[in-house]
């Protein structure tokens, strides 16, 4: 009991990566809820002598926030997906170049084509920040879809860890400065169905260089994280970056 009392007496003098405001509110792990997980987080901080956290440290619950990963380009990534209210949220699923969700995702329903892959409109090499960018439309001009180069930079410069956060499985990307983001393995939509929940499929704003009907995106599962290309009609989440 004396040891426990001493630990709590030292609490005000210890250094934490969690914000002081969050600790005072009881939301130690800054996940937006005060529950038993905060008790566990506080005990780990005290007993392990470490204030390091496992997930993005947002200053409040008013997402999105910018997360600095220490990437060479200086690119800052959003803490959550377009349409999500927290890092673990899947958010919306969007066809490439469309800015609204819908019930069916196929070539016929894809408004940027005439109903077939051959009739896809060429929207330009990179739609990031344009009228076709769902991040810019939904969040404003300070945000945009990442380019394929920014996704490649993320993959090449971050340590990837497969983790579970608030019930959501996904990938934690840890940057050179130990900043990090969590991307839920939200799957993708094809037709009227959701497929491959447990893997991550995220759009970039960059059209595929060889075929107009494809665009680049991020793919990851528990074993790999790579830049890949997808048919543009598919419904996939978007994780924005700052302009």
Where are the regions a protein language model picked out?
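Sec-dependent N-terminal signal peptides
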Residues: 4-18
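Hydrophobic side chains within alpha-helical segments
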Residues: 6, 38-41, 153
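Surface-exposed, flexible loop/turn segments at secondary-structure boundaries
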Residues: 12, 48, 85
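Alpha-helical segments with a strong preference for the paired helices of cellulosomal dockerin domains
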Residues: 22-54
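C-terminal, surface-exposed recognition/capping segments
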Residues: 56-65, 69-243
